A protein has these predicted regions:
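HAD-like aspartate-dependent phosphatase fold
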Residues: 1-124
Length: 124
C-alpha cells in the first residue's frame, strides 16, 4: 500500500486508465473492461471537491463505451484525455511558498490492486 500525506486543500487526481484502474487492454477482450481491486474504494474515498482527470491511449471513438462502463461502476471523473502516447507520463508543478509539495507520483505494477491511502494532515 502507498501512503500519501497531504494537505486538506482540494486536489487534482491524474490517473491512467489501463492497468491502473481497469485490466490493461481489457476493452479488447470479449468480456470487456474490468475494474481492478481497490478502485471502487479509492474513488469512493475522494472528497467531492477533488477533480479527477483520466489518461488513456485509447482512441476517442471508443470513449463512450469506457465512459458508460465507468458510470455503471460509479467511477467519477471530470475529464478523460484520449489518444495519448504510450510512453512516460510526466507531471511538473511548483511548490507552495510555504514549501508544501504540490505534485506526487505513484508508480504501481500493471493490473495490481489500486492501494493508495491518503492521510489528510491539517498541519500542512
Amino acid at each position: 500500500m502507498t501512503t500519501l500525506r497531504m494537505s486538506t486543500l482540494p486536489k487534482t487526481w491524474v490517473l491512467d486508465v489501463d492497468g491502473t484502474i481497469v485490466v490493461h487492454n481489457g476493452h479488447l477482450r470479449p468480456v470487456g473492461d474490468e475494474l481492478l481491486p481497490g478502485v471502487k474504494e479509492f474513488f469512493a474515498s475522494l472528497p467531492p471537491q477533488d477533480v479527477v482527470v483520466l489518461l488513456t491511449a485509447r482512441k476517442k471513438e471508443i470513449g463512450p463505451r469506457l465512459e458508460a462502463f465507468l458510470a455503471d461502476h460509479h467511477i467519477r471523473f471530470d475529464t478523460i484525455l484520449y489518444e495519448l502516447p504510450a510512453g512516460e507520463r510526466i507531471l511538473v508543478n511548483d511548490c507552495k511558498p510555504s514549501g508544501l509539495p504540490t505534485a506526487f507520483a505513484v508508480n504501481k505494477k500493471r493490473d495490481e490492486p489500486l492501494s493508495i491511502h491518503v492521510v489528510r494532515d491539517e498541519t500542512l
